[in-house]
């Protein structure tokens, strides 16, 4: 299968925990050592914890938690599950770590996660964000997680200004967060998610294209991709970003407003993420992206 999207074991060392649309990945590093990748949404705390406990008998053996970026749907579990993992170290970029020390940034993460709670749902006890056991990682740094797990940190800005990805050279596996955008499950292509800077977004995709041919590509939403979907992922995402730029500039040349195309993208793309991305927020994010592209895309003439 080109796409693995069911919770459970994905590879001999890899499991998907929780909801496939906002998953947490579990890496078996050795007989008594584990790592998590991606930080999910707060609503799924007990779901992810239950899945974790099916695979890990002793939570003190979870030693690392790798986070790609600061957005609410990639770190929402941290204050709820870190207190249950006494030996865990959270690894994220310096900018991500700083965001968790910002009262305003934390308020946004908590507010957006509260909007996703089920009826009558209450969140478990949490620690303070600034009490998380974090360590900042840098671009190019090698993370020696275990004897068979050596992952490289690669800066991948553009979607956000703090984004990093994690590359396992041994397995040619890339945990890419939202750096490539959102994988369109109906069409098999990438939908751009440029929420910070278009030039940085494209530069990141160019950099990822220079990696050895990937065997596994693991975005922050939707599961694991294999075959050509993995090998050509960064190239496809680059092409689709330029395609959207051309589409936007053409529509503007015809006198259409950003609002019209924002609404169109929201109607076409919003359904896939509706369970964790409220409609109003999705529409606003489409508008934000088009504003960025409008400012930075090369003109048609």
UniProtKB/Swiss-Prot annotation:
It catalyses: (2-aminobenzoyl)acetyl-CoA + H2O = (2-aminobenzoyl)acetate + CoA + H(+). SUPFAM superfamilies: Metallo-hydrolase/oxidoreductase (SSF56281). The gene is pqsE. Belongs to the metallo-beta-lactamase superfamily. InterPro entries: Metallo-B-lactamas, NDM-1-like, RibonucZ/Hydroxyglut_hydro. The keyword Metal-binding applies. Its EC number is 3.1.2.32. SMART domains: Lactamase_B. It comes from Pseudomonas aeruginosa (strain ATCC 15692 / DSM 22644 / CIP 104116 / JCM 14847 / LMG 12228 / 1C / PRS 101 / PAO1). CDD domains: TTHA1429-like_MBL-fold. Thioesterase activity, but not pyocyanine production, is inhibited by 2-(pyridin-3-yl)benzoic acid, 2-(1H-pyrrol-1-yl)benzoic acid and 3-methylthiophene-2-carboxylic acid. Compounds bind to the active center. This is 2-aminobenzoylacetyl-CoA thioesterase. Keywords: Hydrolase, Iron, Metal-binding. The lineage of its organism: Bacteria, Pseudomonadati, Pseudomonadota, Gammaproteobacteria, Pseudomonadales. One of its GO terms (molecular function) is metal ion binding. Fe cation 1 binds at residues 69, 71, 159, 178. Coiled coil: none annotated.
């Amino acid at each position: 299968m080109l796409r693995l999207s069911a919770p459970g074991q994905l590879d001999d060392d890899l499991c998907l925990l929780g909801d496939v649309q906002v998953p947490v990945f579990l890496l078996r590093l050795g007989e008594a050592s584990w790592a998590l990748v991606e930080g999910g949404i707060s609503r799924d705390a007990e779901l992810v914890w239950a899945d974790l406990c099916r695979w890990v008998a002793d939570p003190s053996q979870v030693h690392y938690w790798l986070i790609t970026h600061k957005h609410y749907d990639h770190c929402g579990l941290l204050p709820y599950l870190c207190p249950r993992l006494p030996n865990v170290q959270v690894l994220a970029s310096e900018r991500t770590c700083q965001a968790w020390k910002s009262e305003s940034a934390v308020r946004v993460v908590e507010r957006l996660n509260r909007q996703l709670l089920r009826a009558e749902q209450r969140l478990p006890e949490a620690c303070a964000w600034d009490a998380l056991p974090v360590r900042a990682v840098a671009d190019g740094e090698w993370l020696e997680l275990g004897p068979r797990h050596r992952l490289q940190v690669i800066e991948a800005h553009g979607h956000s200004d703090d984004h990093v990805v994690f590359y396992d050279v041994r397995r040619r596996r890339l945990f890419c967060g939202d750096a490539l955008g959102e994988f369109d499950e109906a069409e098999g292509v990438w939908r751009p998610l440029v929420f910070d800077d278009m030039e940085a977004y494209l530069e990141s995709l160019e950099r990822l294209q220079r990696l050895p041919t990937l065997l596994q590509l693991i975005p922050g939403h939707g599961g694991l991709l294999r075959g050509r979907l993995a090998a050509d992922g960064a190239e496809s995402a680059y092409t689709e970003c330029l395609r959207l730029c051309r589409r936007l500039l053409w529509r503007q040349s015809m006198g259409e407003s950003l609002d019209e195309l924002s609404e169109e993208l929201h109607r076409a793309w919003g359904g896939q993420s509706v369970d964790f991305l409220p409609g109003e927020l999705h529409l606003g994010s489409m508008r934000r992206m088009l504003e960025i592209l409008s400012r930075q895309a090369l003109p048609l003439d």
